[in-house]
């Protein structure tokens, strides 16, 4: 059998392959930041939505050896609901999902729990082992945005920037 996955989750080799391939995002960002400012600013804060974690890893990769501050925003689910897709910010415990130890949403028996988010791309019960490490070592901070906050951010960005972001980055805009 073979596992095909499009995020930085699962056994280590899949995490490495996906993180390497998405790192082009941060390589390009590093070039653009240096062109804009002449050098890398002393203070830089990089925010990104986090589901499985590949987008954020791609965005942050080239900045890991700098003093950049990383903030990941998970899917907090609907307000007034206990369901969410935010294992790092809602007290989830370590479990095994897709062959990897990670923070994972679990039910009372330790089975994979239900999730809910307006954003299909963030609606995942686990999180990359890389993000678990970044959280535990305090290299990155994590928070969550509710479905309603993401929708409000979507409307504001659409109105003021004249672009229509997907629901995933709308969580980060919130």
Identify the residue ranges that each predicted region occupies.
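A short, small-residue-rich loop immediately preceding and capping a beta-strand
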Residues: 42-55, 70-73
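Buried hydrophobic packing segments
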Residues: 25-29, 59-63, 154, 172-174
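Short glycine/serine/threonine-rich phosphate/pyrophosphate-binding segments
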Residues: 49-60, 80-82, 169-174
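A glycine-rich, Thr/Ser-enriched phosphate-binding loop motif common to dinucleotide/cofactor-binding enzymes
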Residues: 10-29, 166-171
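Short catalytic-loop micro-motif centered on adjacent basic/acidic residues
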Residues: 45-48, 142, 163-166
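Active-site/ligand-binding loops adjacent to catalytic centers
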Residues: 1-12, 17, 37, 65-67, ...
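C-terminal structured "cap/appendage" subdomains that terminate the fold
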Residues: 158-174
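Phosphate/pyrophosphate-binding loops at sites that engage ATP/ADP/AMP, CoA/4′-phosphopantetheine
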Residues: 30-41
């Amino acid at each position: 059998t073979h596992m095909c996955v499009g995020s930085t989750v699962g056994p280590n080799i899949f995490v490495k392959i996906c993180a390497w391939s998405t790192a082009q995002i941060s390589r390009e960002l590093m070039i653009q930041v240096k062109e804009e400012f002449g050098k890398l600013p002393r203070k830089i804060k990089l925010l990104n939505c986090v589901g499985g974690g590949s987008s954020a890893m791609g965005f942050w990769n080239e900045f890991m050896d700098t003093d950049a501050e990383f903030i990941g925003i998970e899917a907090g689910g609907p307000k007034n609901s206990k369901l969410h897709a935010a294992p790092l910010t809602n007290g989830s415990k370590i479990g095994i999902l897709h062959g990897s130890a990670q923070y994972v949403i679990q039910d009372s028996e330790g089975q994979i729990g239900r999730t809910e988010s307006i954003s299909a791309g963030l609606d995942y019960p686990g999180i990359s082992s890389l993000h678990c490490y970044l959280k535990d070592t305090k290299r990155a901070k994590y928070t969550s945005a509710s479905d309603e906050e993401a929708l409000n951010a979507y409307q504001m960005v659409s109105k003021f920037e004249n672009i229509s972001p997907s629901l995933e980055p709308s969580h980060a805009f919130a």
